[in-house]
Amino acid sequence: MGDSTTAGTPGFLSPLEAPPDGRGDVESQYAYWMMKLHPEWLVLNRGINGQRSDEIRERLERDVLREGCDYAIILAGVNDLYQGRTLDSIEENLVAMHKRSIRAGIRTIAATVLPYNTMSQADYKSLAALNQWIRRVSHIMGTLFCDTSATVSDPDDPTKLASSPDGLHPDPSGYRKMGEALARVIEESQVRDFTE
């Protein structure tokens, strides 16, 4: 559940953007790589390019809760920051999506928001604060957590993506890293569930 980073921009249009199956390079979405690792999984791409957290929250019922999912990846907030929305408003929307999903019996994964290469230092400071909050609140709420930002950020400059075709989104290798990291989080949670 998310924005362009979930949809697979710029290489792929999600099924919500280009019904019924999406269009473009299927490798340009983390959902593809999760299913490549686990063919037994059905990972629904519910990303829409350009959406803010409030817009994503509005479609949670339709796009996640009615699908009967076991897990929901919630990755949102970069467009809010880009448009000058407050951290408080983003946090409120993220908490609401996690709470609503958990009440519906869905395990949620709180994913950190990715940087983009043209971010100002002030924007990056807000992004870093949001990602610290996401990590902290996932622990408090008992959700799963994935540091998706760390998987695709330049190790020498975390304000930028390591590899990007447009400076705003990961390339297929970045989406692959995201998919692998998210799959690992689910795998580990399933092992814990089995051993408890």
Regions found by a protein language model. Name each.
Residues M1-R46, L60-G68:
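Serine-esterase "nucleophile elbow" of acetyl-processing enzymes
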Residues D21-R23, I48-R52, D123:
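Short, flexible loop segments at the rims of nucleotide/cofactor-binding pockets, characterized by
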Residues S28-P39, R52-E196:
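Alpha-helical cap/lid subdomain in secreted, periplasmic
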